């Protein structure tokens, strides 16, 4: 076998491979003998059919199969010999082919980029310094009370925090439009569900009032025919309701499965959950900054084959969100996933290089700690831990998580790390903050 390597544009490579004719003919002859020996032919005892007859019947198909197998096998031998690391499947193209002739073919493919990590010392990581305070726990308990609240009709004006039931009809230039009409529509005031100005027009109104408001649809509204349009809404208020919060007592506590200890036990459980969420949020914020810095400091070429693979993964995930509708997900445009796919490939390649250069292997103690920490969110943590330990696939998945965390730790060890005091709510709700 003769091999030459061509460097094409970017990460593209082309191998020119020549396979001696004897290799091809020997493989074809061997396969034809196998057919003659094992298949039945009318008028002949098994294994006694003339080879010329077998060659006439199957020669062309066998040669095609042999050529495909030979190209694949010699491609693998060639990349091993040349120490090349393909990033995707090759495209084969015969250059010279024919009975009794050497097989000359090309294999075109992409290779992984050569990554040389740099600039880790320039990465800035701001570590959040936060804790769960009594006030945070009290606020969370208030949120739980709101989630369990009931609504009671009141003889009061509509305002933020109250709920109204309304009939409305929307029109543009005197003409009603699709989706602009509803009856007994429940609207929680201040929730921001409607277009700007809609809720403002209802504030101060009471049961039975009928009125018209003027609003303008946002330029980025989802319905193309309504973007930026001025509209009128005729509205009737059917009722106004106020939220009634349940008392923080044993009956309320029982709704959350806390059998003993009353309110204090619920507070302790809430604090424990909040502290677990806080720990995860701090870890995620640090990881996000470390990876962002790594990507910024290390621009690399990305094999399109890997991007294509990642797009397929994202499409499959989209199909799961669509209830398993693979066909619907397949129709989604490539552009919808391309940026995210490229980002994931870049991060994967860079973290892989961090792991390689630091000779990292999954720390089994860290793996156990991650499983134990994750299991605390379940009713029976020991059962969850046991389930993981008995499932090799789940254990390998957790080893990958641990290895990625170790890679992030290696980045942070060389980065510029500072601490910043931040509240629990600011960390958990950065947009609202």
UniProtKB/Swiss-Prot annotation:
One of its GO terms (cellular component) is cytoplasm. Keywords: Cell cycle, Cell division, Chaperone, Cytoplasm, Isomerase, Rotamase. One of its GO terms (molecular function) is protein folding chaperone. It catalyses: [protein]-peptidylproline (omega=180) = [protein]-peptidylproline (omega=0). The keyword Transit peptide does not apply. It is found in: Cytoplasm. Residues 161-246 form the PPIase FKBP-type domain. It comes from the Bacteria. GO terms for biological process: 'de novo' cotranslational protein folding; cell division; chaperone-mediated protein folding; protein transport; protein unfolding. The keyword Chaperone applies. InterPro entries: PPIase_dom_sf (IPR046357), PPIase_FKBP_dom (IPR001179), Trig_fac (IPR005215), Trigger_fac_C (IPR008880), Trigger_fac_C_sf (IPR037041), Trigger_fac_ribosome-bd_bac (IPR008881), Trigger_fac_ribosome-bd_sf (IPR036611), Trigger_fact/SurA_dom_sf (IPR027304). Its EC number is 5.2.1.8. Its main location: cytoplasm. SUPFAM superfamilies: FKBP-like, Triger factor/SurA peptide-binding domain-like, Trigger factor ribosome-binding domain. Pfam families: FKBP_C, Trigger_C, Trigger_N. Consists of 3 domains; the N-terminus binds the ribosome, the middle domain has PPIase activity, while the C-terminus has intrinsic chaperone activity on its own. Belongs to the FKBP-type PPIase family. Tig subfamily. NCBIfam families: tig. Involved in protein export. Acts as a chaperone by maintaining the newly synthesized protein in an open conformation. Functions as a peptidyl-prolyl cis-trans isomerase. This is Trigger factor. The gene is tig.
């Amino acid at each position: 076998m003769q091999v030459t390597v061509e460097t094409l544009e970017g990460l593209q490579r082309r191998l020119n491979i020549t396979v001696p004719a004897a290799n091809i003919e020997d493989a074809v002859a061997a396969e034809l003998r196998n057919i003659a020996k094992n298949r039945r032919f009318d008028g002949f005892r098994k294994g006694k059919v003339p080879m010329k007859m077998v060659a006439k019947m199957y020669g062309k198909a066998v040669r095609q199969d042999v050529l495909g197998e030979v190209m694949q096998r010699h491609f693998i031998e060639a990349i091993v010999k040349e120490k090349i690391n393909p990033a995707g499947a090759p495209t084969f193209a015969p250059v010279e082919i024919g009975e009794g002739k050497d097989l000359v073919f090309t294999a075109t493919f992409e290779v992984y980029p050569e990554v040389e990590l740099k600039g880790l010392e320039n990465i800035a990581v701001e570590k959040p310094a936060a804790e769960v305070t009594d006030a945070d726990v009290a606020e969370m308990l208030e949120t739980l009370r709101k989630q369990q609240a009931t609504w009671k009709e009141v003889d009061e004006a509509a305002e933020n925090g109250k709920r109204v039931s309304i009939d409305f009809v929307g029109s543009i230039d005197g003409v009603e439009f699709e989706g602009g009409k509803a009856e007994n529509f429940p609207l929680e005031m201040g929730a921001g569900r409607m277009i700007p100005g809609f809720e403002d027009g209802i504030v101060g109104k009471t049961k039975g009032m009928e009125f018209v408001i003027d609003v303008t649809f946002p330029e980025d509204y989802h319905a193309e025919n309504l973007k930026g349009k001025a509209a009128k809404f005729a509205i009737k208020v059917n009722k106004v309701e106020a939220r009634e919060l349940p008392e923080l007592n044993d009956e309320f506590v029982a709704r959350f499965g806390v059998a003993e200890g009353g309110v204090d036990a619920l507070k302790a459980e809430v604090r424990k959950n909040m502290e677990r969420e806080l720990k995860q949020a701090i870890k995620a914020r640090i990881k996000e900054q470390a990876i962002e810095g790594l990507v910024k400091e290390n621009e690399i070429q990305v094999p399109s084959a890997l991007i294509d693979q990642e797009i397929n993964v994202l499409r499959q995930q989209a199909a799961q969100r669509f209830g398993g509708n693979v066909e619907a997900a397949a129709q989604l445009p490539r552009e919808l996933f391309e940026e995210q796919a490229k980002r994931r490939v870049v991060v994967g390649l860079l973290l892989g290089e961090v792991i390689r250069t630091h000779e990292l292997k999954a720390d089994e103690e860290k793996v156990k700690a991650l499983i134990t920490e994750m299991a605390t969110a379940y009713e029976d943590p020991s059962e969850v831990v046991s389930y993981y330990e008995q499932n090799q696939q789940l254990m390998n998945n957790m080893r990958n998580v641990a290895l990625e965390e170790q890679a992030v730790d290696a980045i942070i060890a060389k980065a510029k790390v500072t601490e910043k005091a931040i509240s629990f709510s600011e960390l958990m709700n950065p947009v609202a903050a």
